[in-house]
């Protein structure tokens, strides 16, 4: 037997909620029970309908009934919906009253799973200078705390998205503070805020943010979350951005190549294709006295592979000359075989494939065919053997084009 569908609820022409469970009558008849109705599913729906289709007096009556308990209602699993509906249909005076009421409890509301949605809705509805200025003043002392919270960070993001520069600058002042930029960028949720801030920034805000990320890049590239911020900046269409990072990181690329997260950034800089940046890294690799260590390192070997792919012919010959003496170390490792596959490069007419004086075997089927066939099982094509999250032996995905890191919440 097919189940019988429950009767649909409806609203009468007078604004009365009509249904088998509730028949509340006209709004004035239940004016003293608004808070009670906010706590029930049917009552909450009734009030939302009243606010949506009722008169301005109806909206004002509901608002006055809930304003004193607004923080608690915004955090309620049911009542937050009537709060959001009120924010959509209220005017400036009610918005200012709501902001004033929230002032003492804004952190608790922003960090609550229901409260954050209601607060974001309130921010969405603020359009006047007085409203945005009031919200700025309430949130200003708490930005650093909120950007590190799984729910609160979305409130900060909404301010950056919705408010013009004059009223969202206070967020950028915190994000670019020299004492805070590393702490925020190296936080699970803070790194997301930094990336979204770059998306929503005006030109002046973006310029300062990029400068701060470059300035603090050495600790950031070594961090599990901070490296994503650096990679995000590297993906931005900014002329010479890779070269700016190399000026800060110069002399440290061998150290960074051997670390889990920073090695991703080193490859990202090399793949950016800026000659000065690439030359700076290749010079350090070629000058390294411990090539055998790099070749066998679980992270640096990928940097060496990228170096072989991105180097010009002269640099490639120098790298080959340094690697050939260590071929015996490479034959029994997966990444060693990948390095060997990149040793051979089709020479340009009139040039040699290897550095003068070096000897290497003729390209084996593995070496010669690797560039023209599918990669070994578990490997990946492209300039970085670990450029995608799948099968990455380092467990640290490289941020691809404009990818935003979204940690699990």
Protein language model features and the residues they cover:
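Eukaryotic gene-expression regulator signature that favors modular helical reader/repeat domains
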Residues: 1-409
């Amino acid at each position: 037997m097919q189940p019988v569908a429950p009767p649909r609820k409806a609203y009468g022409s007078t604004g009365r909620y009509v249904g088998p469970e509730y028949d509340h009558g006209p709004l004035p008849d239940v004016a003293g029970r608004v808070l009670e109705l906010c706590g029930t599913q049917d009552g909450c729906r009734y009030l939302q309908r009243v606010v949506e289709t009722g008169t301005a007096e109806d909206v004002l009556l509901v608002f006055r009934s809930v304003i004193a308990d607004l923080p608690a209602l915004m955090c309620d699993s049911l009542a937050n919906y009537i709060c959001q509906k009120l924010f959509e249909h209220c005017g400036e005076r009610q918005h200012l009253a709501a902001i004033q009421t929230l002032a003492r409890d804004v952190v608790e509301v922003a960090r609550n799973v229901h409260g954050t949605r209601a607060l974001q809705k309130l921010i969405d509805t603020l359009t006047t200078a007085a409203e945005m200025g009031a919200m700025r003043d309430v949130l200003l002392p708490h930005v650093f705390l909120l950007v590190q919270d799984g729910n609160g960070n979305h409130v900060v993001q909404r301010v950056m998205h919705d408010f013009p520069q004059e009223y969202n600058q206070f967020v950028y002042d915190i994000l670019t503070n020299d004492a805070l930029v590393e702490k925020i960028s190296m936080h699970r949720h803070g790194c997301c805020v930094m990336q979204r801030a770059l998306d929503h920034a005006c030109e002046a805000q973006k310029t300062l943010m990029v400068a701060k990320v470059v300035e603090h890049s050495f600790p950031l590239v070594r961090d599990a979350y901070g490296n994503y911020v650096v990679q995000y900046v590297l993906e931005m269409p900014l002329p010479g951005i890779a070269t700016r990072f190399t000026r800060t990181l110069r002399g440290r690329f061998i150290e960074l190549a051997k670390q889990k997260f920073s090695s991703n950034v080193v490859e990202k800089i090399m793949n950016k294709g800026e000659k000065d940046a690439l030359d700076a890294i290749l010079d350090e690799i070629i000058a390294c006295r411990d090539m055998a260590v790099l070749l066998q390192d679980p992270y640096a070997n990928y940097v060496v592979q990228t170096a072989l792919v991105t180097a010009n012919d002269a640099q490639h010959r120098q790298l080959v000359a340094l690697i050939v003496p260590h071929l015996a170390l490479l034959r029994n490792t997966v990444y060693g075989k990948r390095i060997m596959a990149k040793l051979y490069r089709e020479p340009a007419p009139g040039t040699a494939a290897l550095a003068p004086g070096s000897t290497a075997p003729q390209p084996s089927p593995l070496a010669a065919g690797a560039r023209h066939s599918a990669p070994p099982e578990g490997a990946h094509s492209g300039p970085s053997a670990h450029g995608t999250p799948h099968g990455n032996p380092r467990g640290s995905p490289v941020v691809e084009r404009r990818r935003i890191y979204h940690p699990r919440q």
